[in-house]
């Protein structure tokens, strides 16, 4: 199987997001890279599932709370930006202050 650089990047993001989801499910507080991966991978899947850009942005702000991450992480994550594949093409999605 041959994957483009973009496809490899999406696959790595998915894998990191899965690892973060497993840790979160076990009650482990997420660090910075895990929190970003968790949010970004969920945004990618929401876009692929057919949500609109606005719906994906709103959804992204509901994924993690301050209690889900290590101390100080919520203040470090000002925004998460991804290029997501929607049914009508690729679009930039930005979620401001995603950890609330």
Swiss-Prot record:
Gene Ontology, cellular component aspect: cytoplasm
Quote the EC number: 3.5.1.5
Superkingdom of origin: Bacteria
List this protein's GO terms for biological process. urea catabolic process
Instruction: Name the chemical reaction catalysed here.
Output: urea + 2 H2O + H(+) = hydrogencarbonate + 2 NH4(+)
GO molecular function terms noted in the UniProt entry: nickel cation binding; urease activity
Q: What is its main location?
A: cytoplasm
Q: Where in the cell is it found?
A: Cytoplasm
What Pfam families does this protein map onto? Urease_gamma
What are the record keywords, sorted? Cytoplasm, Hydrolase
Which pathway does this polypeptide act in?
Answer: Nitrogen metabolism; urea degradation; CO(2) and NH(3) from urea (urease route): step 1/1
Which family would the database say this protein is a member of?
A: Belongs to the urease gamma subunit family.
Q: Subunit structure, briefly?
A: Heterotrimer of UreA (gamma), UreB (beta) and UreC (alpha) subunits. Three heterotrimers associate to form the active enzyme.
Protein name as it appears in the record = Urease subunit gamma
Query: What organism does the record attribute this protein to?
Result: Actinobacillus pleuropneumoniae serotype 5b (strain L20)
Underlying gene: ureA
């Amino acid at each position: 199987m041959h994957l483009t650089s973009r496809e490899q990047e999406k696959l790595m993001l998915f894998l990191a997001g899965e690892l973060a989801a497993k840790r979160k499910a076990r009650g482990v507080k997420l660090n910075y890279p895990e929190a970003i991966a968790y949010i970004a991978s969920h945004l990618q899947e929401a876009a692929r599932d057919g949500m609109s850009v606005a719906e994906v942005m709103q959804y992204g702000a509901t994924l993690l709370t301050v209690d889900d991450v290590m101390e100080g992480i919520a203040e470090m994550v000002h925004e998460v930006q991804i290029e997501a594949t929607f049914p009508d093409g690729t679009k930039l999605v930005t979620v401001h202050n995603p950890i609330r």
